Swiss-Prot record:
Pfam families: DEAD, Helicase_C. This is ATP-dependent RNA helicase DBP2. It is an enzyme of class 3 (hydrolase). Residues 534-556 are annotated as: Disordered. The gene is DBP2. The Q motif is unique to and characteristic of the DEAD box family of RNA helicases and controls ATP binding and hydrolysis. GO terms for cellular component: cytoplasm; nucleus.
Length: 556
């Protein structure tokens, strides 16, 4: 079997960073958005032209309602795949390094135990312990080493040999574990071994992601590690104009990263096809199912040849994800990093404070004063709230109190969301207020603190929220405000805290014992103060106004 197809021949037309052509951050913003510049690109459009920009209404390109999601893909016809007549393709590239071959199974099992790796399936390859052992081509390894990583992460050590072997793979690992590179680097090798794209061909590699933020981040990784090659890629997601995305697809791209709704829109309108896809990635599969994308995922996969290689990545392994894997993966091998039971990252210090709604603002300020005490610490704080209105209220309150906070939620236009995320990533605005939906897929490294201003609906969302900190081996702190309104969640929260060997507030323990009714009067009644206690605050529909409020008497 040949190794890597004998060098990189490209795909014609040169490498392009299509996201920049879609507008990037360069258009400027105007009016109530509070940004200087303005004119051109997305910033000059009125907010109505984005169809709400949300996850229900945004996928159709901005001018069609959220209920269109229900009918997405109804016009797609399932191809009649005849494997006997389909062109053959190469998908097995792994050649075990002599060092790996020489390791005994006892040594392999010790490595897996030390790194919390468990595997299942037939003939799972041994893990690699160094980048050189993975056997990637020189042009890939040069980019990896340039990033300064000391060694592969656990998911990479086991996942690279699995992906390079051409097998279908399931990977269960927390976000921030390095899984994006686990499938991106083998994707580059896979593309290198395929025939060049012909006019009218669709992509060779398709990556499906739940949100546009995650899709853009995946593209940035592919850009980074494909810099020395000539792989072309594009990012397809809703909430922005279709024109630049259509142009990219029609020019030809080897890699397409997409959210399900916008991709189906492109397929139905004939702007692209999936006939050439031989490497399929489902990233954050559990989140895609949580967000109701299962029908769209099934329709998309029906458009791809059945002998493709499929890699499914998920932070959790619930029944719905298992069913999807059983339906669309063949003889798959599986790698799990850590426990399959839902559990919090043990590197995160969890602090839960039982307080009333009316105490939240003052308590938030006290924590921010400690967190942001020194500019040298480069701390970043992500604040989770329950609604878009509270996100705007909190942001306005913090900015008026001198804190450089910005908010992100589903009603924000895409260009503003990109700008806010960039400000947070770079530390120019080290405090970000977010709702759950807007935060999904956001992968910002070095978040030191998470504050749950409003407690989420369940312990799974709690674990996902606090998992934004403590990534890639770092430590983190999660602070949670818990009120009588959340009493029904007390028992589950206590279980999470005890499993992670965290301190449990005696009041929370007592609440867990009496948590049958939610909001027991023994804790006082703070009912009716939902939305964070902002009785006199802004109550209109969420706009960009909160991010435009001047920061008064900066406290940081």
């Amino acid at each position: 079997m040949s190794s890597y197809g004998g060098g990189y021949s490209g795909g014609g037309g040169g490498y392009s960073n299509n996201y920049d052509r879609n507008g990037g951050y360069s258009n400027g913003y105007s009016g109530s958005n509070g940004y200087s510049g303005g004119g051109g690109g997305y910033g000059s459009h009125g907010s109505r032209s984005y169809g709400g920009g949300g996850y229900g209404g945004g996928y159709g390109g901005g001018d069609r309602g959220g209920d269109r999601m229900a009918g997405l893909g109804s016009g797609l016809q399932k191809p009649n795949w005849d494997l006997a007549t389909l062109p053959k393709f190469e998908k097995s590239f792994y050649k075990e390094h002599p060092n790996v071959t020489a390791r005994s199974m006892a040594e392999v099992e010790k490595f897996r135990r030390d790194h919390n790796i468990t595997v299942s399936g037939r003939d799972v390859p041994k893990p690699v312990e160094t980048f050189d052992e993975a056997g990637f081509p020189r042009y890939v390894m040069d980019e990896v080493k340039a990033q300064g990583f000391p060694a592969p992460t656990a998911i990479q050590a086991q996942g690279w040999p699995m992906a390079l072997s051409g097998r279908d793979v399931v990977g269960i690992a927390e976000t921030g574990s390095g899984k994006t590179l686990t499938y991106c680097l083998p994707a580059i090798v896979h593309i290198n071994a395929q025939p060049l794209l012909a006019p009218g061909d669709g992509p060779i590699v398709l990556v499906l992601a739940p949100t546009r933020e995650l899709a853009v981040q995946i593209q940035q990784e592919i850009n980074k590690f494909g810099k020395s090659s000539r792989i072309r890629n594009t990012c397809i997601y809703g909430g922005v104009p279709k024109g630049p995305q259509i142009r990219d697809l029609q020019r030809g791209v080897e890699v397409c990263i997409a959210t399900p709704g916008r991709l189906i829109d492109m397929l139905e309108s004939g702007k692209t096809n999936l006939r050439r896809v031989t490497y399929l990635v489902l990233d954050e599969a559990d989140r895609m199912l949580d967000m109701g994308f299962e029908p769209q995922i099934r329709k998309i996969i029906s458009q791809i040849r059945p002998d493709r290689q499929t890699l499914m990545w998920s932070a959790t392994w619930p029944k719905e994800v298992r069913n999807l894997a059983a339906d669309f993966l063949t003889d798959f091998i599986q790698v799990n990093i850590g426990s399959l039971d839902l559990a919090a990252n043990h590197r995160i210090t969890q602090i839960v404070e039982v307080i009333s709604e009316s105490e939240k603002r003052d308590r938030l300020i006290k924590h921010l004063e400690k967190i942001m005490d020194s500019r040298d610490t480069q701390n970043k704080c992500l604040i989770f709230v329950g609604t878009k209105r509270v996100a705007d209220d909190i942001t306005r309150f913090l900015r008026q109190d001198g804190w450089p906070a910005l908010s992100i939620h589903g009603d924000k236009q895409q260009n503003e969301r990109d700008w806010v995320l960039d400000q947070f990533k770079t530390g120019k605005s080290p405090i970000m207020v977010a709702t759950d939906v807007a935060s999904r897929g956001i992968d910002v490294r070095n978040i030191t603190h998470v504050i749950n201003y409003d407690y989420p609906n369940n312990s799974e969302d709690y674990i996902h929220r606090i998992g934004r900190t403590g990534r890639a081996g770092a430590k983190g702190t999660a602070i949670t405000f818990f009120t009588t309104e959340n009493a029904k969640q007390a028992r589950d929260l206590v279980s999470v805290l005890q499993e992670a060997k965290q301190h449990v507030d005696p009041r929370l323990l007592e609440m867990a014992r009496y948590s049958g009714g939610g909001g027991s009067s023994r804790y006082g009644g703070y009912r009716g103060r939902g939305g964070g206690g902002y009785r006199g605050g802004h109550r209109s529909a969420a706009h960009s106004g909160a991010n435009a409020v001047p920061v008064a008497n900066r406290r940081w």
